A protein has these predicted regions:
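Alpha-helical bundle regulatory/interaction domains
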Residues: 1-135
Length: 135
């Protein structure tokens, strides 16, 4: 029987365990580590990545790599919202926003803000800078 998850956003904001051991452990790892790849999660769980991917797909019907990537986008959005609130409006020039994007990318585990923006575009329909300007 598949454990159906409505959305990654629902998983991201959920705080109660589901009772599915693999599912709950993966979510706990995502909440506490800056991981990008299923191999990293599998290493922490001490399981083969192939087995983890298969188990995750059986439980959720989604690919683990897609969930991890979307999770990181949600974390970046949360961090950007928080930091933007701390920056005064007169400092919100393009240069300051680029610095904020670099800081966010590093904090959320991406190699660069360019990579983060590319992923943002895929998941949000806009680059991270354009998304940030809408706030």
């Amino acid at each position: 029987m598949k454990h159906i998850v409505e959305s990654v956003e629902e998983m991201y904001h959920a705080r109660q365990p589901t009772g599915e051991v693999i599912f709950d452990e993966v979510l706990d790892i995502l909440r506490h580590y800056k991981l990008i790849y299923p191999e990293d999660v599998a290493l922490l769980m001490d399981v083969k990545v192939r087995d983890l991917r298969a188990a995750w797909f059986m439980l959720t019907g989604t690919r683990l790599v897609d969930v991890i990537t979307h999770w990181r986008v949600l974390q970046a959005q949360d961090w950007l919202r928080k930091r933007l609130g701390e920056i005064s409006t007169e400092r919100c020039e393009k240069g300051e926003l680029v610095k904020l994007l670099k800081e966010t990318a590093r904090r959320c585990g991406w190699r660069s803000e360019v990579v983060m923006s590319h992923v943002f575009k895929r998941y949000c329909g806009t680059s991270a800078l354009e998304w940030l300007k809408t706030l």
